[in-house]
């Protein structure tokens, strides 16, 4: 009580200074609150941008056999998962010598919605006979495919001297390589998308994306964890 009385007495004796001090405190609190709000808002904006650009997932498991996907689906720490399967390479008439292929990838609906598939034109594939292509096919490969066109691809495994090659193996003009075990498939181009983050800049194939509900023999599985899973 004594301290309170002394404080009130001092405030009354120094009204002007007290008013200035009070205003200063209010302004400081307002400034701190504004800065905290800006930081939080900026952080949320960065998170949303990253989700939209590169995908809304936390972990990825590569080359998961089809028979093991059910174990991931039933894992209580996993809130959601998305399936991506590399179907193979097909030779196209690209004008970029370092990128002579289409690399055909299938995605399930969840993957298309959560892995940064940004449409420029058209729509996403809804069946296994539809496909979307990246803008870089035209800007980099000088191929003028349009939405509504049909494209026939001989899709197979890229190989050199008996070794299987993937998107992390750049195309070497001086090295002999071939596409083996090809299967011919005709697709309707239903959309054009921005280049996806899952395609390395040095990749030899432009990523063409088709639809698949259940994946294939080997899948890259992108997972989004529960809060409990994140803590563990």
Model-identified regions with their sequence ranges:
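Basic-flanked hydrophobic alpha-helices used for secretion and membrane insertion
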Residues: 40-232
